[in-house]
Amino acid sequence: MTHTPQSGTAYRARLEARAGRLAGPTANLAPGHVQANLAILPADVAGDFLRFCQRNPKPCPLLAVSEPGDPALPSLGHDIDVRSDIPRYRVWRDGQLAGEPTDVRDLWRDDLVAFLIGCSFSFEEAMLDNGLPVRHIEQGCNVPMYRTSIPTEPAGPFRGPLVVSMRPLKAADAIRAIQVTSRFPSVHGAPVHLGDPAQIGIADINRPDYGDAVEIRPGEIPVFWACGVTPQSVVAAVRPKFCITHAPGHMLVTDLLNSRMAVL
């Protein structure tokens, strides 16, 4: 995959996160660059989690996997340190959220393996380029995300509900969004559901499980995409002894280009 010089906006964003000066959501940050979800697990369960991602490519499209104990990800960009280059992390112990630090270097171990998973923020650039509105960017907030009643395909101990992100669109725009996002299978691809949220187990569209609620205007329908926060719902269900993820909406900004993610 092609990536940009280290002097680009993506590298600067990582340095800002590393220095503790970037702590908010990364939507629309470093335009043109692929952003990634994160899951870090001990090596003894990493093989099962790899199979989980392979069996669930819509919510968990793998971009890279680190070597055990190695925080570098050279295939994704220059000088990446997965322990510090994300604005906010989540630390899980026995399936319970134990903290949201901005740096996990003090928690790093030689047996930890990092999984970087494609993020829908990449296809949002293509949506904007095609004149499609992205409401959470308009409102300056995080994308709304919901746990659903749709099961994932299990692998070893890893199983749990699919998490989806939502963007409200008019019907004609929703059709165009399907066409646009279908070109990006490595960053979740086409929607998994349109319309009635109750059909996928969402009781209240105005109360997302992650992120922020956004306005749904008259004439719009909710459009749902598989989401890379799915591993966090799986962590809650599986309750591994130790796990680190990104905080929802707080991604690793890579040097990879969104334009290189398209398949057509």
UniProtKB/Swiss-Prot annotation:
The keyword Lyase applies. InterPro entries: D-Glu_cyclase (IPR009906), Putative_hydro-lyase (IPR038021), UPF0317 (IPR016938). Gene3D superfamilies: PSTPO5379-like, PSTPO5379-like domain. Keywords: Lyase. It is an enzyme of class 4 (lyase). It comes from the Bacteria. One of its GO terms (molecular function) is lyase activity. Transmembrane segments: none annotated. The keyword Membrane does not apply. Its EC number is 4.2.1.-. HAMAP family: Hydro_lyase (MF_01830). Belongs to the D-glutamate cyclase family. This is Putative hydro-lyase Bpet2233. It comes from Bordetella petrii (strain ATCC BAA-461 / DSM 12804 / CCUG 43448).
